């Protein structure tokens, strides 16, 4: 059975972390970077989340250009998994495909559409009133 840590980024820069397992985790399996998931999977009813990335149990980042869920060694000029220090530097890096699988441990997501209640209300946060 898969279990994930889902990190949901808000427009204001706040990030919320959720532990997801069981049936809720199955809603993510088979989805790829750029696809949307119902917010009920992480306890945010009425919200819609877009998968923006993630990583596997070894820390390999998900790469949107790699189909499937397998690992691949790519020659990277920069971007996901490698930040060059000099112009023209390239490096072979191992990345995970764009599809969420049982090997995925962390999923990054952003909010596409909001529900009626605020996230703070849903999570039991304190009001500043």
UniProtKB/Swiss-Prot annotation:
GO biological process terms, semicolon-separated: translation
Give the span(s) annotated as Disordered: 106-129
Q: Does the keyword Ribonucleoprotein apply?
A: yes
GO terms for cellular component: ribonucleoprotein complex; ribosome
Which Gene Ontology molecular-function terms are recorded? Answer: structural constituent of ribosome
Know the name of this protein?
A: Small ribosomal subunit protein eS6
Show the coiled coil region(s).
none
Q: Which SMART domains match?
A: Ribosomal_S6e
Q: Which family does it belong to?
A: Belongs to the eukaryotic ribosomal protein eS6 family.
Which Pfam family would be a valid example here? Ribosomal_S6e
Q: What does the UniProt keyword field contain?
A: Ribonucleoprotein, Ribosomal protein
């Amino acid at each position: 059975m898969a279990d994930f840590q889902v990190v949901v980024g808000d427009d204001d820069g706040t990030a919320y972390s959720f532990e997801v397992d069981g049936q809720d985790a199955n809603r993510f399996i088979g989805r790829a970077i750029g696809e949307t998931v119902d917010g009920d999977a992480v306890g945010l009813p009425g919200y819609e989340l877009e998968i923006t990335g993630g990583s596997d149990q070894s820390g390999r980042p998900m790469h949107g250009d790699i189909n499937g869920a397998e690992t691949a060694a790519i020659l990277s000029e920069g971007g996901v998994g490698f930040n060059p220090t000099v112009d023209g530097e390239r490096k072979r890096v191992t990345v995970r495909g764009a599809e969420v699988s049982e090997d995925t441990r962390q999923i990054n997501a952003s909010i596409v559409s909001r529900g009626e209640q605020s996230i703070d209300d849903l999570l039991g946060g304190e009001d500043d009133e």
